[in-house]
Amino acid sequence: MRSHSGSAAQVTNGRHTLGSWLASAAVVARASPMDTPPWHPSPIQTRTGIWTGIETHWARAHGRFLVMGVRPLQSVRSEPFQKSWIFLPRIMADKLTRIAIVNHDKCKPKKCRQECKKSCPVVRMGKLCIEVTPQCKIVWISETLCIGCGICIKKCPFGALSIVNLPSNLEKETTHRYCANAFKLHRLPIPRPGEVLGLVGTNGIGKSTALKILAGKQKPNLGKYDDPPDWQEILTYFRGSELQNYFTKILEDDLKAIIKPQYVDQIPKAAKGTVGSILDRKDETKTQAIVCQQLDLTHLRERNVEDLSGGELQRFACAVVCIQKADIFMFDEPSSYLDVKQRLKAAITIRSLINPDRYIIVVEHDLSVLDYLSDFICCLYGVPSAYGVVTMPFSVREGINIFLDGYVPTENLRFRDASLVFKVAETANEEEVKKMCMYKYPGMRKKMGEFELAIVAGEFTDSEIMVMLGENGTGKTTFIRMLAGRLKPDEGGEVPVLNVSYKPQKISPKSTGSVRQLLHEKIRDAYTHPQFVTDVMKPLQIENIIDQEVQTLSGGELQRVALALCLGKPADVYLIDEPSAYLDSEQRLMAARVVKRFILHAKKTAFVVEHDFIMATYLADRVIVFDGVPSKNTVANSPQTLLAGMNKFLSQLEITFRRDPNNYRPRINKLNSIKDVEQKKSGNYFFLDD
C-alpha cells in the first residue's frame, strides 16, 4: 500500500471530487486494483448515499478510524476503476449518540427475508449489530455497533426501522426508557407547589410518560431498562434538584396523585351507574355542589354515565378529580369536546384547586386555554415515538412562543424547521359574496321534544368555509341535518337538495381490518388520486399508519383517518364536527390547512363546528353564531363576517381576546384585567389589530 502524504486521493465521478471534501477530514490511501489491506473483508455491493455517484465497496472500524473502500458507480466510470480506502476519524461518529427505534406494530420477521440483517455492513463484517430470525417476534439493533449508514431503514419492506441521531449531552440525562429500541424520555418537568404547570408538545413526545412518573405510577429507570435502579440510586441521580424532595415525599406516601385520563370516551366502560351516585361516592372534600354548579352538571345527576355526550363526560371526569382529596392533580387534555364557555369554566374550576401545598399539572393542546390556565410552562421536543426532551420551566407567554417558534434560546437549539404562525383568514367582502352566491336556504323552524331551533335565512358559496360558533346543545348538528335534507323543517321553505359528507364528533371504529382496507372500501377512487394524496393524505401523515389495525389506533390517529374519509367522499357540503379533538397543536394547524386547501381546490362548501379558538379563526371565511338557551330555544343567525361574528359570540360569553404580537395567536384576557376592561368598553371583544 502506498500512502500519499499531505494530500487526499482524488476519486472523480464526473460531478463531485471526494478529495477536496476529505483533504481536511481524513487520511486517504490509494491502492491499485490488486492491492488489499490485511484486514480486507469480502467485498459487498451497497450504496450508502453519502456521496453522489460513489458506492461503498466495504467498511470496517480500525483503531481510531472508520475505514471504507469506495469506488465510482459502474454507470459513471470512464476508465478502469481504482479502489480507494478512506480513513474517517471515528470521533466524527462519536459526537452523536444513535438510538435505534423498532416499531413493534410494523416489524414482522416471519413475513420478510430479514433484509435488514442481510444488508447491514457491520453484520457482514461478522459483528452482531442486528439480531433477527424468522422465529423472532421483533428485530434487535445494537446502538453501540450501529454506524448509522441507514441501509437497514431503506431495505425494511415494512418501514419498521428508524435510526435517530441524538446529541451526546442528552445521554447522561435519560430519565426513562421502556425497553431496547424503544422510546426514551430525557429530563422531567419540575412541578412547583401552589402553581399550575402546563405541558405543551406534540403527540408521542412523552407527556403522558412524564405524568405517570410524576404521579408515582411509573418508576423511572434512568435508561437502564435491563437492570432498573433502586429508589436510592434514583434519588441520588436527582440530588440537588427540586425533584429529589418531590420523589422523597412520594416514597414516604406523603403525596397522593390523581390523573384525569385523556380518553374520556372510555369512561363508560369502566364506570357504571348514575352521575350523582358516582359523585356522591367520590366526594371527599364535600365540595360536590359547588363543582357541579361551576361545570353545569347539576341537571345531569340522574343520568347514566353511558348516556352522556363527549362534553358531558369531560366535565364529569374533571368534577370527579376536583372533589377528591389529593396533593397532586393532573389533567390530561381537560378541554376536549368542550365549547369555549365550558373550557373557561373548567379552567376556573381547575385553578380553584390551587393551594400552597398542592401540585397541579395540565397537558393541553388548546393554546388559548393553556395560556389562561397555567402559571408556567415546560415544552417537550424531540422525535415522536423515538425520544422526548423536557425544557426548563418558562413563563406562560415565553413557553408557548418557544414551542410555536421551534427554537429553545436557553439551549440554542432548533427543534422544528418552520415556525407556526396563526394568521386569520381573509374574509371576502359583501359585494364578492353576492356575485359568487351559489346556494340560498330559507328561514326555518324545527321542534324536537322540548328543544326548538329557529334558523334565519342565509346563503353560502362554493370554496367557502363556514364556522359555526355556539355552545354545545344549541342545534349546530340539527341545522346541518336540515340543510342536508335528512330532517324536514316544521315551518319554512324548500331546502336545496345537497349531498353531505359528515365527520361526527365521536369516532368509534367498527372496522376490524387495516387503515388501508378501510380507505379502499370507503373512498377507493379518492385515496389513490394524486391531487387527494398531495392535499390530504400526505399532510395528515396517513401513510405512516396505513398498515395498522383500525382498532389499535390512538385518538389522534383515528381523528386523522376520519378526516381523510370525510374529505374523500364526493359531496356538495362537508360537515366537520370538531376536527381538532385529540390532535396536538401542530396537527391542528395542519388539519386546518388540509381542510382549507381541499375546499378551495374542490370548489365545495364546508361547515365546521370547532371550539378551539385558534383553529376556528384560522379556518373561518364567515361565521354563523348560535344564541339562545342551550337544549331549549336557540336561533341560528345568518352568516356574518369573521370580525362581526366573533364580536357577537364573545359578547354573549363576556370574554375578550387579544393577539400575540409575535405569532398572532389569540390570547384570552384575564377577567377584569386592564386589557379586558378596555376592550369591553370599546366593544372590541375580538381584537384583530397587530
Give the location of each predicted region:
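Iron-sulfur cluster-binding cysteine motifs and their immediate structural context
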Residues: 37, 113-135, 140, 151-168
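ABC ATPase nucleotide-binding domain signature region
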Residues: 169, 192-286, 366-397, 459-531, ...
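ABC-family P-loop ATPase nucleotide-binding domains
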Residues: 175-180, 186, 221-313, 324, ...
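ABC ATPase nucleotide-binding domains
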Residues: 197-200, 390-457, 462, 635-690
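Walker B catalytic motif
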Residues: 304, 331-334, 341, 350, ...
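Hydrophobic anchor residue at the start of the ABC signature
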Residues: 317-318, 346, 563, 591
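Helical segment within the ABC ATPase nucleotide-binding domain
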Residues: 343-356, 588-602
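Conserved H-loop
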Residues: 357-363, 603-609
